[in-house]
Amino acid sequence: MIVGVGVDVVDVPRFRAQLERTPALRARLFTEDERDLPLRSLAARFAAKEAIAKAMGAPPGMMWHHCWIPRPDHGDGRPTVHLTGTVQAQAEALGITHWHLSLSHDGDVATAYVVAERRAAEEESA
């Protein structure tokens, strides 16, 4: 069952300006493993984090670095969502068991689309 859907679009030059204007922002938004990625990849990951928040109803108190979008390390190249802390607690409270994520960037725009899903126990074993 779909619990929520989220989408976000980031203007890459504007995002760059925000990171340059507020150096501490990079550490607040991204995990240590994400921080050294190219700017367009960071913008897409920020869009993903915004989309994840929207899929969960934009709960207050979410810590952005509690959501990690690593580089795909499996053969199909699909991005994955890893949660800890405040974001994981909210996902668990909503019964979210699976995330479907699509990232894209082209020119000055980065975008992310996410579907939050709750699967029944019998679906898990299938």
UniProtKB/Swiss-Prot annotation:
Keywords: Cytoplasm, Fatty acid biosynthesis, Fatty acid metabolism, Lipid biosynthesis, Lipid metabolism, Magnesium, Metal-binding, Transferase. It is found in: Cytoplasm. GO terms for biological process: fatty acid biosynthetic process. InterPro entries: 4-PPantetheinyl_Trfase_dom, 4-PPantetheinyl_Trfase_dom_sf, ACPS, Ppantetheine-prot_Trfase_dom. The keyword Nucleotide-binding does not apply. Its main location: cytoplasm. Its cofactor is Mg(2+). Mg(2+) binds at residues 8, 50. Its EC number is 2.7.8.7. One of its GO terms (molecular function) is holo-[acyl-carrier-protein] synthase activity. It catalyses: apo-[ACP] + CoA = holo-[ACP] + adenosine 3',5'-bisphosphate + H(+). Transfers the 4'-phosphopantetheine moiety from coenzyme A to a Ser of acyl-carrier-protein. Belongs to the P-Pant transferase superfamily. AcpS family. This is Holo-[acyl-carrier-protein] synthase. The gene is acpS.
